[in-house]
Every structure is written in C-alpha cells, then in structure tokens.
Amino acid sequence: MFPRRRVLIVVGLLLSAAASSALAQRFRVMEGPGMPLHMPPSHFSDGGFTICKMMYSSNRREANGFGWSTDYPFAGLNLMVRSSELTKTRISKDGRGEANYWTVHLTDDALFECPFLVGSDVGTIGLAPLEVTRLRQYLLKGGFLWVDDFWGTRAWEQWADAMREVLPEFPIFDIPPDHPIRETLFEV
C-alpha cells in the first residue's frame, strides 16, 4: 500500500505542475521574438507622430536579452500612447484607432520617414557596414535616436564602439550640470 500512495502523490504533483504550466501559457503575454513585425508603409500618410523600432544586427547575446526585439512592441506603443495623453502631440493611428508603431531595418528607405527611432538592448549591437552608413545618414539628416536597456559596462562599450563607427567625429561625452539643455523646459 505504501508504494501505491507514493505513486499517487507523484502523479498528483505531475498533474499539478502540468496544469500550472498550461495555465501560465494561456495568460502569457508575448513580447520580443515571435511577435509579428509592423513594417512601415511606403509613406506615412496621416501625418501623425510615430515611433519606429530599429532593427539591427547583433554580434553577441546577453542573458534575458533579445537584441533589437527587447520590449517589442509594448514599450514603443506605450511611449506613443503616453505621448499623446500627456502632451498635445497627435500620434499616427491605423484604421482601428491604434497607434502606428513601425519596425524598420536600418537598410530600409522607410528609415528616413521615421522622426523618432528607438533602439533597445543596443549593448549587443554589431552593425554591418551598410547599417553603419545608413544610421550615419539618418542621424546627419536630423533623425532622432533613443537607445536604452544597457546591461553593464560591456554593453555600454559595445554601443560606444558602434557609435564611434557611425559618427567618429562626434565623441560621446557626459553633459555637464550647467549645460543649457538641462534648463530648456525644466531644470534637471
């Protein structure tokens, strides 16, 4: 009788684990790899502000990082929605009234339609020569690039090395506390 009891306990634990796993997958929010890409149209027709997610090449991986697709698509969508709620910025919307948030390769011509480019987890970036050229062109034409999600010194150095290739004549430096940009709208 003792072995039968042990078998029932093991079977019960296995069923509980399987049910918990199935339930967790049912409510899982997909993000990052596996999410459908929202590629931009040939031209942005509604004239509203939009944000584009920068797709770039990576030459290494980090634990819990997904390269360009980190936080995709929810971080960008949230940023756009909050921009429209907290400012007078009119954002680009699709036919259903949802925010247009595009995914763009650095090699796509649509890059130059993006006023605001977001790069996530850029500590894994490893740009191909054409990506270096295109990102340089984008930035020199006045494009705005926001990058985030660095994980340590190695990630920062990886990003800084990439930017030294893209804009060698513009070194990265800390903005001093008395710089005018810190008092443009609010004192920081």
Question: What residue spans do the PLM features occupy?
Answer:
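Surface-exposed patches in mature extracellular/periplasmic domains of secreted proteins
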Residues: 88-103, 147-152, 170-178
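An acidic, glycine-rich "communication" segment
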Residues: 26, 31-35, 59-63, 154-188
